[in-house]
Regions:
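Glycine-rich beta-to-alpha transition loops that act as phosphate-gripper elements at the mouths
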Residues: 96-108
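Alpha/beta enzyme core
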Residues: 1-94, 108-124, 130, 134-138, ...
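Extended, intrinsically disordered, low-complexity segments
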Residues: 137-176
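Residue-level marker of alpha-helix boundaries and capping positions
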Residues: 6, 44, 101-102, 157
Length: 176
């Protein structure tokens, strides 16, 4: 989150209050994951302070907590250097399931290490968008897009390819 900690806690509590009557889970972000989801701006990253993560968890009761450990939304301009020391400390100090935003471009080895160290959910949206675009372009260039359903099929195939690739990387195939 780009909000100061106190504001982030207050906003998250407000959202949780709205979500709970509907049985909806709430995921919140603490620390500042760099980049931006649509790649339109470069936002500086600030790693999550483990003490702040403990306070955030205690004061909000959030269902899942996305932390900043050197990860960034969108495509990386350089190879990310993840702070596994911070991840390990947050995982040790909290009980809330941990989330990694900005998974696109992280190496398979680092994905596995994240999972082994406490991350339970990894977001890979940008990789999915890129795979969909690449698949649609390939189908279009091959003359295989004759209408809406062809386009939709190519989009689904692109998303499937990326999801399948990451399922294999994460080692979660056959573990539904």
């Amino acid at each position: 989150s780009h909000l100061p900690l106190d504001e982030n806690i207050a906003e998250t509590c407000r959202i949780i209050e709205m979500a709970r009557p509907y049985g909806a889970a709430v995921e919140a972000e603490i620390g500042c994951v760099g980049g931006s989801e649509d790649g339109s701006e470069e936002i500086a990253m600030h790693c999550t302070d483990p003490a702040d993560a403990v306070r955030f968890e205690q004061e909000t009761g959030v269902d899942a907590l996305a932390i900043a450990i050197g990860n960034a939304h969108g495509n990386y301009k350089a190879t990310p250097k993840l702070r596994f020391d911070i991840l390990a400390q947050v995982a040790e100090d909290t009980r809330t399931p941990l989330v990694l935003h900005g998974g696109t471009g992280i190496s398979p080895e680092d994905f596995r290490r994240c999972a082994q160290t406490g991350i339970q959910k990894i977001n890979i949206a940008t990789a999915t968008f890129d795979s969909v675009e690449q698949t649609v372009r390939g189908a279009y260039d091959a003359g295989a897009i004759g209408g809406y359903y062809d386009l939709q099929g190519a989009e689904v195939q692109g998303a499937y390819k990326n999801a399948h690739r990451h399922i294999l990387i994460f080692g979660t195939d056959g573990k539904a």
